[in-house]
């Protein structure tokens, strides 16, 4: 089965073709991603209207290129899958309407994919990972620990009660006058800094709950920077290094408790694994801390290649293929959802907004 996938939930426009065989093994035939960093950089963050217009301008040619790279025509695909949420509503509409039109024109089944499910299942595409396993999703919009039991069977163990980790990186960068995107900029500066100079907080460390919190850490960065004005380059580097060290300690504590929870629930699991996905998973310091943690607990550490950690359409095509193996297609009347929790059974946390839980 060969699936055309489309991803337009935020600031990457993407199209891909993925093949899933009868044994459930996957192969990427093409994967095309166009970043909008240049469009959003002057504003220091993603502007939804600009993002939606950029998707409109680029998506048709990216779909054509994905088909060309896979040496296929639209008639050759077996189904079309697209991100239906969560994300920026304008971008979701562009991708979803395009996918529906292609599915209708080619008379192919259509599958609406939860963007978070795409991240959740990527390790099955890249590593053939069996169920169950743990997922740590760390990105600009999400920070979650999710227990992956099977297709459509997800339990959110913990989530951020305020800022997502990627957002904390971006806001820290902005406070310190670093360029957008903030995550890579903070990581680069941290290489030149002293991680022990500033004693920044480790939010929720030691608590039994499995949730995350990063707003207090971000506030501590602001207070530290304000006290040092004017900031030298070394001050900025030391703040970045101290911030990154605090994040690594916090993640190790929070994730470590989730690993223990997994062991208690699945004592006979022979292949316990932690999968890390999302753009923040590219941070080498955080990856090293999590690898050390997994080794200590006897878990495999799995981080898909960077181009599959960040937003892409191969993961959407793969999630569509996984669902197509056992489920009926979705209706072409299906609407996009700006907020779409991966685990819809979990109650939204206080502070998730009047519109409901985003994830």
From Swiss-Prot:
EC number from the UniProt entry: 2.3.1.234
InterPro entries in the cross-refs: ATPase_NBD, Gcp-like_dom, KAE1/TsaD, TsaD
UniProt signal peptide: none
Top-level EC class as recorded in UniProt: transferase
Entry keyword set: Acyltransferase, Cytoplasm, Iron, Metal-binding, Transferase, tRNA processing
GO BP terms: tRNA threonylcarbamoyladenosine modification
SUPFAM superfamilies in UniProt: Actin-like ATPase domain (SSF53067)
Alphabetical list of NCBIfam families matching this protein: gcp_kae1 (TIGR00329), T6A_TsaD_YgjD (TIGR03723)
Protein name per its UniProtKB record: tRNA N6-adenosine threonylcarbamoyltransferase
Source species: Brucella anthropi (strain ATCC 49188 / DSM 6882 / CCUG 24695 / JCM 21032 / LMG 3331 / NBRC 15819 / NCTC 12168 / Alc 37) (Ochrobactrum anthropi)
Lineage: Bacteria, Pseudomonadati, Pseudomonadota, Alphaproteobacteria, Hyphomicrobiales
Gene: tsaD
